[in-house]
Swiss-Prot record:
Residues that coordinate or bind Zn(2+): C396, C399, C412, C417
A single MF term (Gene Ontology): DNA ligase (NAD+) activity
Family label: Belongs to the NAD-dependent DNA ligase family. LigA subfamily.
Active site: K112 (n6-amp-lysine intermediate)
Keyword Kinase applies: no
Biological process according to GO: DNA repair; DNA replication
Keyword Zinc tagged: yes
EC number(s) on file: 6.5.1.2
Protein name (record): DNA ligase
Gene3D superfamilies reported in the protein's UniProt record: 5' to 3' exonuclease, C-terminal subdomain, BRCT domain, DNA ligase/mRNA capping enzyme, Helix hairpin bin, Nucleic acid-binding proteins
Key words, A-Z: DNA damage, DNA repair, DNA replication, Ligase, Magnesium, Manganese, Metal-binding, NAD, Zinc
Length: 660
């Protein structure tokens, strides 16, 4: 066990050193800060439990170095430390709570600029030198390059000796403009700013629009007592400071501090520069000295960092996927990138029209996001590295049938298409539908390829004992598959109706049908025999549109679909589902909800199911058409978006009565 732990520590140290070089020296990081920080935390945890394996070269005792060989190394007059950081607001609040302000609350909050750290040295009011942070003890002398930044005064009105800390950055607009002309584009504005600053020829640097904010005094010659006085002094001396820095005193509360952080978080995409969090600092310098320092960071400051909402990557290939409805969806295979807490290697391109609108082809560098914090999508082309635009093929990749365009999408219209068939079976077995345990995509694909099944009906006629002769299918697994199939026969009618795959008929629409007394196969079948009457009846239900109405009518007049229903009825499936309809249910019927956060004593899935049973419609993301957002503790980015769109907010107390 000890050897295994020692090896993990060594592996972590090696990996972190590699990432340090990529970030600080090459300006080409391969992982997001969130991933890096999690590895640092893991290393700290192991070293804390096993101090016998902690060595002096551990990254937990140091921070990364940006020292380069082609610049002179100069010693800093004071240690240039890093910042401690958290990704959780509760941990940030805990840090504030632990500080003894002695009844004199004083905190400053400012955006954490995602740029390149710099230290400026003034002698008698004249800029003497500018050093990168380096390894905290030594930095590279980039004075000539820094002198080209017009926001840095070369001479001050006062003859003072100063050591100042700032952040060199480049605006979002200039990042996109410059990146288009670079042979090897940068993945972030921070990396571009860092790369420009490290150019050997200062004449080249002068051609780029670098910017800077100064945010700290590192020497005490001016005898300033608080951070607000220090920032005011910086302004007076002619330095550019972030206008969004705000100071909170004894008249303020932690709630006001957290509200301001929420405000910055909400508005960050509108800022002209990239930020990756906010920085909180104790304002009183006497208290700062009392709180002290570690070898890594001051104890009087804390960075609250955001998880990345988007990232940049290169498109390596584009594959065309065929869905259960025959819809063709192009998907980009991209270099691995970390966005919103997950690694992404594939991102949807929606359809051919979308590809044309962004001018995308294989080889281009793109911006990737996770829409609704779930579905990865390509947002735009950052750098056009290839000629032309990708074209979806004319024929289905699975059955070679000529594709037909309906609206913005291409479809394979072949009902016997193998890709369509296998996707329908996967959908039927999926968790949201019949939830047939053990039938993974891999298992279903195996059964389909061996021609044991060709439709969902075959799941109930196939002799699963035939699988015993195949590798990976032992007695217990086969027995579990059979039991899962039997258990699925007891599922409610709403699940069967969803699983059968009527085009665009989802859980919410089914719930609306049931609330309007269309809660059985026989009722729906009888209604749809008179197409005109069925159409007008369905359109009277709020939330049922023309497309869904026509698809329902078509399905209940289609012989293949009706034969499926008849098959399941003969097997003993439930073909009717009772639902309690009262005045309370009607208040929620058809209303569109979304949910975020955690709820004491209730999982989100339970809340969703209970409200769905009363007619509520649940959406996965916040949009303009949403009626309500239910907000629990630790609410995410959905709350920010809902406030921007003026969506009504409901607390747990507001919905509690509906959960009984």
């Amino acid at each position: 066990m000890s050897i295994k732990i020692q090896q993990e520590i060594e592996d972590l140290k090696k990996l972190i050193r590699k990432w340090d070089k990529e970030y600080y020296v090459d300006s080409l990081p391969s992982v997001e800060d969130f991933v890096y920080d999690n590895h640092i935390l893991r290393l700290k945890e192991l070293e804390s439990r096993h101090p016998e394996y902690k060595t002096l070269d551990s990254p937990t005792l140091k921070f990364g170095s940006d020292l380069l060989n082609n610049f002179e190394e100069v010693e800093h007059s004071v240690p240039i430390l890093s910042l401690d950081k958290v990704y959780d607001l509760d941990l940030l609040k805990s840090w504030i709570d632990k500080i003894d302000f002695n009844n004199s609350f004083n905190i400053s909050v400012e955006p954490k600029i995602d740029g390149c750290s710099i230290v400026l040295y003034y002698k008698d009011g004249i800029l003497e030198k500018a050093l990168t942070r380096g390894n905290g003890k030594f930095g590279n002398d980039v004075t000539k390059n820094i002198r080209t930044i017009r926001h840095i005064p070369l001479f001050l009105d006062e003859k003072v000796d100063l050591v100042l800390r700032g952040e060199v950055y480049i605006t979002k607009e200039n990042f996109f403009k410059i990146n288009k002309f670079l042979e090897k584009p940068y993945t972030s504005s921070r990396n571009l700013a860092s790369g420009i600053l490290r150019r050997v020829d200062s004449r080249e640097v002068a051609n780029f629009p670098l910017n800077i904010f100064i945010y700290d005094f590192l020497n005490a010659e001016l005898e300033l007592k608080t951070n607000d006085l220090a920032i005011a002094k910086l302004k007076k001396l002619g330095f550019k400071v972030d206008p969004l820095i705000r100071f909170f005193d004894q008249k303020s509360s932690i709630i006001e501090v957290l509200n301001y952080i929420a405000d910055i978080t909400k508005k960050r995409n509108s800022f002209e520069y990239e930020i990756d969090g906010v920085v909180l600092k104790v304002s009183e310098f006497v208290l700062r000295e009392k709180l002290g320092y570690t070898s890594h960071h001051p104890k009087w400051a804390m960075a609250y960092k955001f998880e990345a909402l988007s990232g940049f990557s290169r498109v390596n290939s584009i594959v065309v996927q065929v869905g259960r409805s025959g819809k063709i969806t192009p998907v980009a295979n991209i270099d691995k990138v970390f966005v919103s807490g997950a690694f992404i290697t594939n991102a949807t391109l929606h359809n051919q029209d979308y590809i044309i609108s962004i001018g995308l082809n294989v080889g281009d560098v793109v911006k990737v996001s996770r829409r609704g914090d779930v579905i990865p999508a390509v947002e735009m082309v950052i750098n056009k590295c290839s000629k032309g635009v990708f074209k979806v093929p004319d024929n289905c990749p699975a059955c070679k049938t000529v594709l037909v365009k309906e609206g913005a999408h291409f479809f394979c219209t072949n009902n016997s298409c193998p890709s369509v068939a296998v996707e329908r079976i996967k959908y039927f077995c999926s968790k949201n539908c019949m939830d047939i345990e053990g039938f993974s995509d891999k298992t279903i694909s195996f059964l389909f390829e061996k021609e044991f099944i060709s439709s969902e009906i075959d799941l109930y006629t196939f002799n699963f004992y035939k699988l015993l002769k195949f590798k990976g299918f032992k007695d217990r697994k086969v027995y579990n598959l059979i039991n899962s199939i039997e258990a699925s026969k007891k599922k409610p009618f709403s699940k069967l109706l969803l699983s059968i795959g009527i085009k665009e008929l989802g859980e919410n629409a089914i719930r609306l049908l049931f609330l309007n007394n269309l809660n059985s196969f026989s009722k729906l079948f009888r209604l749809c025999q008179d197409r005109n009457f069925a159409f007008s009846t369905l359109l009277k239900i709020k939330g049922i549109g023309e497309k869904i109405a026509l698809n329902i009518i078509e399905a209940f007049n289609d012989s293949t679909m009706l034969n499926k229903f008849k098959f399941f009825e003969n097997l003993g499936f439930k073909m009717e589902e009772s639902i309690l309809i009262d005045d309370e249910n009607r208040l929620l019927a058809g209303k569109k909800f979304c949910i975020t956060g955690t709820f004491n004593g209730y999982s989100r899935s339970i809340i969703i199911d209970k409200l769905k049973n009363k007619g509520a419609i649940f959406k996965t993301c916040v949009t303009e058409g949403l009626d309500f957002l239910i907000v629990g503790e630790k609410a995410g980015s959905k709350l920010e978006k809902a406030l921007n769109l003026n969506v009504k907010i409901m607390s747990f107390e507001d919905i509690k009565s509906y959960l009984n």
